[in-house]
């Protein structure tokens, strides 16, 4: 009778132990907390953290020692306001005597140029019925028709003008516009040389620009002067005909 209850007791204990192992939870109640342990040894230093943001600027430090070298020159500033007019200075020393007017070449040259311009203006004004400027030249006419030699004389008062002689297409077009306006022919400042067909300006230089009518010149030395048609083309002609006088200045 005593052996059965003892065997039953062992069986219950075995079953109770099996239940505790499977659930890993003991059914016993928690015990009373123990006393805190003593402080352990200090741990090792941790790894460096990420770089933080820059801090605010610190206060200005005291002045340094010796001054540094001067810096480079800056840019030129804007001009300032005009200053007040200064007082009149003392007269300078008297200069050396100048040359008499008739011996001063520069003065004589200037006076000659002024005289030339005055006479040239007078010549242009005497032909002021029609004037046309091309480059540095002025072409003018008084509308009168005369023989070549009379035209030559009327264009050269005091040697400031001459009979118009085109030396470029632009000048030829300008003279042609005057001829067309008056609806007549005009003499040009050209003459035939000793050799038939060779023409020269009145200063003796060979002609470097021409605008002959087709087939001209064909006077074969008998027509020494040159006339311009209303279309601007040229023809050789004897010098006794009456043609429009056009001058250039």
UniProtKB/Swiss-Prot annotation:
Record-level Gene Ontology MF annotations: carbohydrate binding; metal ion binding
Known glycosylation sites: 208
Modified residues (4-hydroxyproline): 30, 33, 36, 42, 54, 57, 63, 70
Pfam families: Lectin_C
GO biological process, one term: respiratory gaseous exchange by respiratory system
Gene3D superfamilies: Mannose-Binding Protein A, subunit A
Binding of Ca(2+), residues: 216, 218, 235-236
SUPFAM superfamilies for this protein: C-type lectin-like, Triple coiled coil domain of C-type lectins
Principal subcellular localization: secreted
Domain C-type lectin: 133-249
Oligomer status and interactors: Oligomeric complex of 6 set of homotrimers.
Miscellaneous remark of the record: Pulmonary surfactant consists of 90% lipid and 10% protein. There are 4 surfactant-associated proteins: 2 collagenous, carbohydrate-binding glycoproteins (SP-A and SP-D) and 2 small hydrophobic proteins (SP-B and SP-C).
Name under which the protein is recorded: Pulmonary surfactant-associated protein A
